[in-house]
A protein has these predicted regions:
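Conserved catalytic Walker-motif region of ABC-type ATPase nucleotide-binding domains
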Residues: 1-4
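ABC transporter nucleotide-binding domains
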Residues: 6-203, 207-208
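ABC transporter nucleotide-binding domain
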Residues: 169-263
Length: 308
């Protein structure tokens, strides 16, 4: 994607964004509601044109080779359009025929996606009788039917129960490296648990990109260590403040133990442990406190608001 923009009248829904997704990569497309995620996906799946910029999917230009792009993409929209009067197998046969699958190849494809999406128990049931979770599975099976190299999934776990969410996450992870996956969502834990890399979009602009650990690292101001040490807060806090690189120490007493939050230029876990051992202090907790993806997301979105 290069310098992609989309206007609706004077409203700028997508603002000059650029990014690349590699073969076999699972990338989360993350942003609050109204950020421009779905508009971008509609452009990449040839549902609507961009105002300016360029994009290729599986080597095909989305503006001049739309049929080739559609053939290379399995797309699952947020609200899966299904025919409620059809049975699941009947619907998949219909969709397979639209994809150019016939005869033995189509039935083999249906069997493959039925098993992969856990639809065996409902394959002959009318879609109107299916729960939200099973309808989502049918939509995912449809996207996988023609075994496309690229999968674009828009909010694939919305409406699913916790067990179904875990199963869907597992399935998406299994799809790599045979498929390139773009997963659009506004649900932070969903993206963090599933994706290798995250692209954050806000008000149409790409505001951050990186792996979950890289994004968390960006918000960390130095290294924060949490420790619980047996003893008086004043004595322990004073000793820790003398350690090299320490910029802040918060100490409080809990049931005879001192709980410390230590911010320093580097990871001081080993130094704190050595200090406690030398002074004869018992330690029952010592770990680095990493910033959460939620912290980063809130900071980046809030920062974008402040810049406006």
């Amino acid at each position: 994607v290069r310098n992609l923009s989309k206007y609706y009248g004077t409203h700028r829904a997508v603002d000059n964004i650029s990014f690349t997704v590699a073969d076999g990569e699972i990338v989360g497309f993350l942003g609050p509601n109204g950020a421009g995620k779905t508009t971008t996906i509609r452009i990449l799946t040839c549902f609507q044109p961009a105002t300016s910029g360029s994009a290729t999917v599986a080597g095909h230009d989305v503006f001049t080779e739309s049929l080739a792009v559609r053939a290379a993409v399995g797309y699952m929209p947020e609200n899966v359009p299904l025919y409620p009067e059809m049975r699941v197998r009947e619907y998949l046969r219909f969709r397979g025929k639209l994809r150019g699958l016939d005869g033995t190849a189509r039935e083999a494809a249906i069997d493959r996606v039925t098993q992969r999406c856990w639809l065996e128990d409902v394959i002959n049931r009318p879609i109107s009788q299916l729960s939200k979770g099973f309808r989502q599975r049918v939509g995912l099976a449809d996207a996988l039917l023609h075994n496309p190299p690229v999968l674009i999934l828009d909010e694939p776990t919305v409406g699913l129960d916790p067990t179904q969410i875990r199963e869907t996450r597992s399935l998406i992870r299994e799809l790599a490296p045979d498929h390139t996956v773009i997963l659009s969502s506004h649900i932070l834990p969903e993206v963090e648990a599933t994706c290798q890399r995250i692209i954050i979009i806000h008000k149409g602009k790409l505001v951050a990109s990186g792996s979950p650990s890289e994004l968390r690292e960006r918000i960390s101001e130095g290294a924060k260590v949490i420790a619980e040490i047996k003893g008086a807060p004043d004595e322990i806090g004073a000793a820790v403040r003398q350690l090299p690189g320490v910029t802040d120490v918060q100490a409080e007493r809990r049931d005879g133990w001192t709980r410390l939050a230590v911010v320093a230029a580097s990871d001081l876990r080993e130094t704190i442990a050595q200090t406690a051992f030398t002074r004869g202090w018992a330690v029952r907790e010592l770990h680095r406190d990493a910033a959460s993806l939620e912290d980063f997301f809130v900071k980046i979105v809030t920062g974008a608001h402040e810049q406006e």
